[in-house]
């Protein structure tokens, strides 16, 4: 039955009863997420797609990758070698020349007869020995303007080197129960005025049985002229040449000759302790070595 012309058309043409009506084709929905990407036989496989997360990882890994070749290039090797060598050189210089030695027991055997110590005299104990505060590098090492030398007894305790002047023997002050030898105070006073609070250089020879270091010592008194302290004591007549069967140390045959000539010169003029050889005093005069020998014999008899 035909619809009247004023009637509304049918809701769905697919329900048209006309036998000649053809059904409208239905378009398939796109479901890309569920499509099977398996290639057909004879067909090439599609290229995989790169996600954003994977591309980010590749970019970060390329940034963090280490290029080991750059460490073998001259522009890297040369500065590194120079820096390392400079550091090792500074450490070597500090250990060999700028390290302070607190006491005689810390002196390496390699120093004896090869090295010298620069320091300041803090006290004079006798006519032939004193205490030295080691100041490595001197003024170039900052001493006296950046680094101060201690002055108090507590500050200097266990921090000074006991030096024994080589090649000479001065009159003994009273100690160990022994009386003072004639001219001992005069010799001690002269050496104190000559050395105390002055910078000296000591050329080390060996340690002695009392924990001291036997050394030839030089001091600058006038301008740039350095003077041998032991030689000056001999010239002034406040010491004699060291005489003993063993343990005699002069620092060489040349120094020994100078010392003996200086002693003979002062003896002829009757300077210092040699004044006792004049007139009636000659019978009572004895050298520092003779005094020590007599004291040792008397102590042995008392035992």
UniProtKB/Swiss-Prot annotation:
Keyword Nucleus assigned: no
Catalytic residue positions: 164, 172, 212
Transmembrane segments: 77-93
Skewed-composition ranges (Basic and acidic residues): 283-303
GO cellular component: membrane; mitochondrion
Gene3D superfamilies: 2.40.50.90
Residue segments, region Disordered: 1-59, 281-303
Polar residues biased stretches: 49-59
Enzyme Commission numbers on file: 3.1.-.-
Domain (TNase-like) ranges: 115-276
Family matches, as InterPro entries: SNase_OB-fold_sf, Staphylococal_nuclease_OB-fold
Residues reported in the UniProt entry to bind Ca(2+): 169
Localization in the cell: Mitochondrion; Membrane
Membrane topology of the entry: Single-pass membrane protein
GO MF terms held by the record: endonuclease activity; metal ion binding
Keywords carried by this UniProt record: Calcium, Endonuclease, Hydrolase, Membrane, Metal-binding, Mitochondrion, Nuclease, Transmembrane, Transmembrane helix
Presence of the UniProt keyword Metal-binding in the record: yes
Chief location category: mitochondrion
Domain of life: Eukaryota
Similarity-based family: Belongs to the LCL3 family.
Protein name from the UniProt record: Probable endonuclease LCL3
